[in-house]
């Protein structure tokens, strides 16, 4: 495991959380790249035969993925998990217009947890589908994150994700400057090393 430590620079989570909280209201206006990546990931997910009861969206942000989950899976339990409380508040506000109808029909099945994805306060083997789109780059310890995800996944569950690699540094720097008022980005782990980490943590 020591040989599989990720190459990210240590992230000051407190500073990043403040930045995302500040950007919550306008995040959707600028996150074009992230939205396209999520659409591509949904295309891949739609080809996989799985009927999850519990879906966990790690780094859910403003809840943009909720409609995609609802389109593929009907009446399932969706958990939005993010370390920015204001991002989650924004996600809740998108759902509020439908809460009355959802409660009436018994379909109000979205919950929200504010926390760090490196520390998942979720029951073991509960989650059938763990989704993470454009968020793993905010982890300081990918090995720890993958181990935590493996522990909460149900037997036969699916972990599907996308993350940024070294070649996306230029694009992400421009996005960070607009959204977070910061043009610095991390050095990202390449997919070969991420693959090794996944295997080391029991994924197949």
Please name every model-derived segment.
Residues 1-26, 35:
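N-terminal, positively charged/glycine-rich alpha-helical extensions of SAM-dependent methyltransferases
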Residues 33-52, 68:
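Conserved alpha-helix/loop element of class I SAM-dependent methyltransferases that forms part
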Residues 42, 70, 146-150:
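A structural alpha-helix within SAM-dependent methyltransferase catalytic domains
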Residues 54-120:
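Class I SAM-dependent methyltransferase SAM/SAH-binding core
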Residues 118-130:
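A short acidic, Gly/Pro-enriched loop at the edge of an enzyme's catalytic core
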Residues 128-143:
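A short SAM/SAH-binding and catalytic strip from SAM-dependent methyltransferases
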Residues 143-158:
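A short glycine-rich, Lys/Arg-flanked "PGG" loop and its adjoining helix->strand segment in the class I
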Residues 158-204:
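Conserved catalytic/acceptor-binding region of the Class I
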């Amino acid at each position: 495991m020591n040989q599989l430590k990720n190459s990210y620079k240590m992230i000051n989570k407190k500073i990043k959380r403040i930045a995302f909280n500040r950007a919550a209201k306008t995040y959707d206006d600028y996150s074009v790249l992230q939205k396209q990546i999520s659409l591509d990931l949904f295309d891949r997910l739609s080809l996989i035969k799985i009927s999850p009861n519990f879906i966990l969206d790690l780094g859910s942000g403003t809840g943009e993925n909720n409609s995609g989950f609802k389109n593929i899976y009907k009446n399932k339990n969706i958990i939005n998990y993010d370390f920015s409380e204001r991002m989650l508040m924004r996600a809740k506000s998108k759902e509020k217009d439908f809460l009355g109808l959802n409660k009436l029909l018994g379909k109000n099945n979205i919950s929200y947890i504010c926390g760090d994805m490196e520390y998942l306060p979720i029951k073991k083997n509960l989650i059938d589908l763990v989704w993470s789109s454009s968020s793993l780059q905010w982890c300081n310890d990918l090995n720890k994150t993958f181990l935590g995800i493996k522990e909460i996944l149900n037997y036969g569950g699916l972990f599907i994700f996308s993350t940024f690699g070294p070649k996306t540094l230029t694009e992400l720097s421009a996005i960070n400057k607009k959204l977070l008022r910061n043009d610095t980005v991390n050095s990202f782990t390449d997919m070969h090393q991420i693959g090794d980490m996944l295997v080391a943590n029991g994924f197949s």
